[in-house]
Amino acid sequence: MKGVAPFFGIKAGPRRELLKEHMAANGVPTVDELPTVVRDAFTCQERELHHTAVDLLTKQARKLGPEQLPWIEDALTAKSWWDTVDALATHVIGTILKRHPEAIPTWNERWITSADLWLNRTAILFQNRWKADTDLDLLFTNIDRHAARQEFFLRKAIGWALRE
């Protein structure tokens, strides 16, 4: 993670506790407020703000639908790195698409055919927590489309998806 972006130096536990205290005092952002909160967090350089935005989205994931995916995709591609991309793919996007399987073909095709490595990684990983509900045909098709690529982060995603 060194060199990817600056950090405040706040570890995950204390950062999450600060978020919890803030939400207790100020309320949880509504679904309508989330796009602004997330975009604002991702315009900042410090990674803790990106992680906080991901934590907020993870907590609200069951309230989100496919209509939120365009601005969630913006977060995926803003200052992309494996930590935020993986959390968004598996905990947020995976939750949304499992609840709204009709949206999978459109979003999967968009991401798996993208020139953006992080969107490709998202298409490979979004089913990771689905266990027995994983669409193996879709997963293997996604993997086959990128199996020859040598990028470290794609190869790691393929390995992780296969282990799950």
Where are these regions (language model features)?
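Surface-facing alpha-helical segments and adjacent helix-coil boundary elements at the starts of domains
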Residues: 1-164
